[in-house]
Amino acid sequence: MTKNFLDPQLAKAVSGEEERQRHNIELVASENFVSKAVRQAQGSVLTNKYSEGYPGKRYYGGNEYIDIAENLAIERAKELFGVSYANVQPHSGSSANFEAYMAFLHPGDKILGMNLDSGGHLTHGASVSFSGKMYEAQSYKVDSETELLDYDAILKQAKEFKPNLIIAGASAYSRTIDFQAFRDIADEVNAYLMVDIAHIAGLIAAGLHPSPVGLADIITTTTHKTLRGPCGGMILADEKYAKRINSAVFPGSQGGPLDHVVAAKAAAFYEDLQPDFKTYSAQIIKNAKTMADAFSKEPDVRVVSGGTDNHMFTLDLTKTGLNGRQVQDLLDSVSITLNREALPNEKRSPFVTSGVRIGTPAMTTKGLKENEMLQIEHLIMRAIHAHDDKNELTKIKRDVFDLMDKFPFDSNPF
C-alpha cells in the first residue's frame, strides 16, 4: 500500500486514520467512503501536471491526457444532472460558492441566504465568511414552531431587502427544499437564484429529491458527501452562463486545477451513473428515516422538525443536560463520530451548541441497513445515559467494534 513509502511519522498518521475509519461508526453527514477507483485516480501521476486553463485552451503544453480526464468529468456531470454546462475545477464547495458570487455579483451587492442556526452554511452570508464581508448579507430563518422553511416569510423579507442574489440550500436542513418556491421569490424581486446542493447532490442525481435544474441560475455543489467522490467542488448552469463562470473560476479565483482530483471526480461520476447508485441513495434515506424515527420515540432527545426527508437530521440534546460538544466528545470516546450542531434560534456558541447532526451516507456505503441503524441509535442513547460510567462506555466501544467488524472497510456492496 502507499503508506509503505511514507516516512514513519506520516505513515503512523495515515495508518491510524485508516484504522479509525475501519472501526468507527461514521455519522458525519458530510463524509463518505470513496471507492478504490476514486482513490486510484486521486493518487495517480496526474498530480504531477499543471494545467491552467480549460480543455483545448491551456497555458501549458503536454495536457492531452489531462484534457481527456477533465472532459470525462464534465460530460459525466452534465449527464448526471441533466445540465448543458459544468465546471469541475473548483477546489471545494466554498470555492464554488465564491466563484458563483464572482460570476453574478459585484462587491457590495445584496445576498439573502439561510441563517446558520437554521441550517445554512458559512458561505451563504455569515459575517465571519467572505460572503458576509464582501457582500451586504441578510439571512432567512426556519419557522420557530415548525422548524421548516416559511416561503411566505422569505418572500416578505426578500421584498423588503431586495437582494441581487438569493441562495437556497443548506448544510443542516433535513427537509425537502421547494426550489420552485425559491424561483418564484427570486422572480418577484428580480434576483438571481443560486442553489447550493452540496449535501443533497447525490439524492438529486438519483432522482430522490427535486432538482433545481431549470429553476436556478447557477448551482453549486461539493463532489463528496452523497456523491461519494473526492473532496472538491463543482458548478452547474445553463451554457449561456459558461463564459462568466469559467472566467470567475480561472483566472478569477484559481490558477491551475487539481488534475488528480478532477480525474477522481470523473471516476466518481461514472459510478454515480450506474443503476445501483439509485439503490444506494434510496438506502441512505431509509437509514436516516429509520434512525430519526427511533430517536423520536426517546423521551430525552428531540429530532429537529420532527424527522427527515434526506440523509441527515439534527438532535436537540437539551433534556439530556449535555451540550453538543459534550456529546460529540463522549461519542468520540466510544468510536462513534458525528458533529455538534446549532439548533434553530441557538443560544449557545457554535463551539458548544445544543445539538448534534447525524448523517447516514458513509454507513450506507459500508452496507449497513435499517436494523443496524436501530442498533446505532441504541448505542448512542446508551452512551448518553452512561456518560459518566467508564465501565459502561468501555462496553459500548466494544459493541461498536463488534458491529463494524461485520462490515469490512472495503466491502462496499454498492
From Swiss-Prot:
Q: Which InterPro entries match?
A: PyrdxlP-dep_Trfase, PyrdxlP-dep_Trfase_major, PyrdxlP-dep_Trfase_small, Ser_HO-MeTrfase, Ser_HO-MeTrfase-like, SHMT-like_dom
- One Pfam annotation reads SHMT
Question: What reactions does this protein catalyze?
Answer: (6R)-5,10-methylene-5,6,7,8-tetrahydrofolate + glycine + H2O = (6S)-5,6,7,8-tetrahydrofolate + L-serine
Q: Which UniProt keywords apply?
A: Amino-acid biosynthesis, Cytoplasm, One-carbon metabolism, Pyridoxal phosphate, Transferase
* Gene3D superfamilies assigned to the protein according to its UniProt record, in alphabetical order: Aspartate Aminotransferase, domain 1, Type I PLP-dependent aspartate aminotransferase-like (Major domain)
EC class: transferase
Q: Name one GO biological process term.
A: glycine biosynthetic process from serine
Which Gene Ontology molecular function entries are recorded, alphabetically?
A: glycine hydroxymethyltransferase activity; pyridoxal phosphate binding
The biological pathway it contributes to is: One-carbon metabolism; tetrahydrofolate interconversion; Amino-acid biosynthesis; glycine biosynthesis; glycine from L-serine: step 1/1
As for subcellular location, the record says: Cytoplasm
Q: In this UniProt entry, which residues are annotated as the site Plays an important role in substrate specificity?
A: H224
* Principal location listed in the UniProt entry: cytoplasm
Which parts of the chain span the membrane according to its record?
none
What EC number(s) has UniProt assigned to this enzyme?
A: 2.1.2.1
Choose one Gene Ontology CC annotation of this protein and give it.
cytosol
Cofactors required: pyridoxal 5'-phosphate
Which residues are involved in binding (6S)-5,6,7,8-tetrahydrofolate?
L116, G120, H121, L122, S349, P350, F351
Domain of life, source organism: Bacteria
PTM-bearing positions, type N6-(pyridoxal phosphate)lysine = K225
Query: Does Kinase appear among the keywords?
Result: no
Q: What is the role of the protein in this entry? A: Catalyzes the reversible interconversion of serine and glycine with tetrahydrofolate (THF) serving as the one-carbon carrier. This reaction serves as the major source of one-carbon groups required for the biosynthesis of purines, thymidylate, methionine, and other important biomolecules. Also exhibits THF-independent aldolase activity toward beta-hydroxyamino acids, producing glycine and aldehydes, via a retro-aldol mechanism.
Its family remark reads: Belongs to the SHMT family.
Self-association state and partner proteins as the record states: Homodimer.
Family matches, as NCBIfam families: PRK00011.1
Entries under HAMAP family matching the protein: SHMT
- Give the protein name, as stated in the record: Serine hydroxymethyltransferase
Source species of the chain:
Oenococcus oeni (strain ATCC BAA-331 / PSU-1)
**Source species taxonomy:** Bacteria, Bacillati, Bacillota, Bacilli, Lactobacillales
